[in-house]
Each structure stands twice: as C-alpha cells, then as structure tokens.
Amino acid sequence: MTKTLPKDFIFGGATAAYQAEGATHTDGKGPVAWDKYLEDNYWYTAEPASDFYNRYPVDLKLSEEFGVNGIRISIAWSRIFPTGKGEVNPKGVEYYHNLFAECHKRHVEPFVTLHHFDTPEALHSDGDFLNRENIEHFVNYAEFCFKEFSEVNYWTTFNEIGPIGDGQYLVGKFPPGIQYDLAKVFQSHHNMMVSHARAVKLFKDSGYSGEIGVVHALPTKYPFDANNPDDVRAAELEDIIHNKFILDATYLGKYSDKTMEGVNHILEVNGGELDLREEDFAALDAAKDLNDFLGINYYMSDWMQAFDGETEIIHNGKGEKGSSKYQIKGVGRRKAPVDVPKTDWDWIIFPQGLYDQIMRVKADYPNYKKIYITENGLGYKDEFVDNTVYDGGRIDYVKKHLEVISDAISDGANVKGYFMWSLMDVFSWSNGYEKRYGLFYVDFETQERYPKKSAYWYKKVAETQVIE
C-alpha cells in the first residue's frame, strides 16, 4: 500500500556552516579548532567546502525549484563573535541577515542552529564545554542571536550533543582528539545540556517569537541476542551513552535512577567522576517542558553484544567496508546481524530503527510535543555521469525512512517534517569530500550544482506527499 505524509509536512534539506560555507577566514570570521585540526590530521580542509557563503542564492533557488520548503542552517559562532565573546563582527551579522532574507524570498523556511560542532578556537582550546565558563559564553551568544535575528521562526540550540562528546573524547576523531575518556563524554553532554536549558529558558522568559528546540542524534541500540540478558544490558548501557542521558536531561530535567546506575557502572569500570551541581538540575528542570520540538538525526542502528575486554575503537573514515571496530570496556561491542545492509563506512541501514526511536520518545517522554527528522540520508561515493548522479540507492534509502515516518504518524507520533542530509554535497567532518549526501551534486573544482536523480524524486514526493 502506498504511504502518504500530511499536507503541512516540511520537506527540507540540511546544511551546516562549517561543512558548507567555506570562507573560513573571510570578513572577520574567527578561527575554530577544526581549522588547524584538519590541517594537522586529515587529507582535506573546509576550504572551499560548497562555497555556500557566496553561493547560497543558487542553492536556495534550486531548493525552491525542487520543492524543498525548509532548510537547516547553522550560524557560525565565530562569524558573530570571532573569539566566542566580546566584540561582535558586523560583517558576520550582515551575512546571516542576507541569508535569511534570501530563504524567505524563496519560500524556504530556515531552521537555524546556534552550534553545529564549531566552538570558536579561543573557547575550544580553553576546555570547550568541559569548562563551565563556556555555558555563560554560549548563553550570551544565544541571547545576541535571538535579539538580532528576529526574522528566524525556528531555533535549535545545539546539533548533536551526543556525537560532540563522542567525537571529542571517545572516538577521538574531533578536536582535541582524546580517546576513551567516558567521564569527559558524560561531562560534555551534561554541560551542553545545561547550556541548552539556560538558552531555552531565556528565550521563553524574554518573550521572543518563534519556536525553540534541540537536535539530538539518536542511533537505535539493539541487543545482538535479545534472549541473552548480557547482550540486553550491553544495549542498555550503549543507549545511555548515546541517547538516554541526553534525552533524560532534555525532557525529565534530571537523570533517572536507571540512567545514573548505568553511568556510575561505566565510570566505575573506566575511571573518572562527574561534576553535577544542584544549580544544573534547577536549570534542566526549568526548561524540560519548554522545548517546542525535538529534532532527531537518524542514520543507523547498532547491535550490541556483551564483551569482556579493553576498549578499542577504529573509525572507518575512508569508506573501506568492514574496517571499523567498536568495543567499550564494561559496556559491550558492536556486532551486526549478517543480513543487515551496511554502507561503505560501515553504517548500518535499518529504517525500522527510526520508527522504534520515534515511538520510544513518544512513550518515554510524553512532553516531547513534536518531532522533526532533522537529518537522514545516505553517504555514497557518487558517480557523476551525464551531468547527474543515478543514485537509486539513495532514493531507496530515503523512501524507506519516509515510509516508517508515515507509519509512526499513523501510530500517533507527532512528526512534522523531514530534512534530508544534505541539501547539496558538503564536506564530511571525518571523511572529507569523497562521502557525498546531497540532493544536488557539487563539482568542488568549479562549484557548479547539478540535481541528482534523487532531487527529481524528492520534488515529486514533496509536491504530492505520496511516497512512491
């Protein structure tokens, strides 16, 4: 049976400042930790990315032509405050006013994120969000943006608090490149959630118009053997690290006893302790019912198996299928069922996981209000032929995920939109330019845009709300 989506459903495309804009030192932009980190550790940099800084009118015109009626944009904190605080950079402010005006001119609603992996270098090198002073700096930056950019109707505080802690302190593929420090992971999650809560409370108390929420990456975690209590426990602990800890903070305003039992076990085995203060929980509690929406980024699920050994994580950054490894002491290891498809980067393709995650939020956090799927898409080494990309695999991937969203809506979940990652090809943080996601192919040499076959398919779905 053909499935449909509601008439008012947003069919969006997603971007991020550092992955799309380029112009990393243009017009007074301050440095971010990624600038030097990429030069020192990778085979690419964020120049020119998709040159969105100059070419946004082209991308927004294409958006309008292809039925894309929402766009995720992030503001580069260091374009507004080059050192994260103090002096404002007027050229950065002007750029975003121009960008939002172009969005509205093209009837593409901007959903604007304040922080998408790009803390200004001056603050990042001072401990980033492990340093509590950064909470104040973020709230001040947020307040400036709320006041200044009153044309924005949809705000999100952070993109993917989970993967930031994970990338910076567990996998170690984000600056500062620290590995296997679970205490830092949880402390980063916690301090960022306090920053989120403080910004949301300020937004509501100040009476700004529009809506505000947060974007969480929520990869669903399953036990490898559902009948083995040790595998079930491994999946629960892995879920706490990546999902439950931050969801509890968002919607309960505290960490449930079960969550803290898991956190304490993980830290007992791996070492370290957390600094959780009364005023933090007061801030979390004050904001727990103020979120207007939850953004869910979903790409994959994982299966967890009980494991007794040392932590070892190998990140597959070059698309060499089967090269990744993930095992955490006292938690478990990832082990996928044989029949589940994977991408070249070992990301497991499992649309049912998105349905399960939506329904989990609905069941466990009934004060969620509404959900947008703020990122979902297929990274691929696209072949450019005949001025397009025949990306049937991507169409199939998006179609199956839209179908489970339709199912979730039928089963009572309030899901209001979907943003494909990504609108156009952008550079990927730890994979460079080979891993493409866009509806529009970008020739990074010439910066020309070419619609892929998926763009034509997406346009039809957006126009008809029929998934076929």
From Swiss-Prot:
A GO cellular-component term linked to this record: cytosol
Catalytic residues identified in the record: 160 (proton donor), 375 (nucleophile)
Enzyme Commission (EC) number: 3.2.1.85
Keyword tags: Glycosidase, Hydrolase
Pfam families in alphabetical order: Glyco_hydro_1
Any one GO BP annotation for this protein: lactose catabolic process via tagatose-6-phosphate
InterPro entries named in the record: 6P-beta-galactosidase, Glyco_hydro_1, Glyco_hydro_1_AS, Glyco_hydro_1_N_CS, Glycoside_hydrolase_SF
Pathway per the UniProt entry: Carbohydrate metabolism; lactose degradation; D-galactose 6-phosphate and beta-D-glucose from lactose 6-phosphate: step 1/1
Molecular function terms from GO: 6-phospho-beta-galactosidase activity; beta-glucosidase activity
Catalysis performed (reactions): a 6-phospho-beta-D-galactoside + H2O = D-galactose 6-phosphate + an alcohol
Gene3D superfamilies in the cross-refs: Glycosidases
Top class in the EC scheme: hydrolase
Chain residues that bind D-galactose 6-phosphate: 19, 116, 159-160, 297, 428-429, 435, 437
Family recorded in the similarity comment: Belongs to the glycosyl hydrolase 1 family.
Name of this chain's protein: 6-phospho-beta-galactosidase
Originating organism: Streptococcus pyogenes serotype M1
Gene: lacG
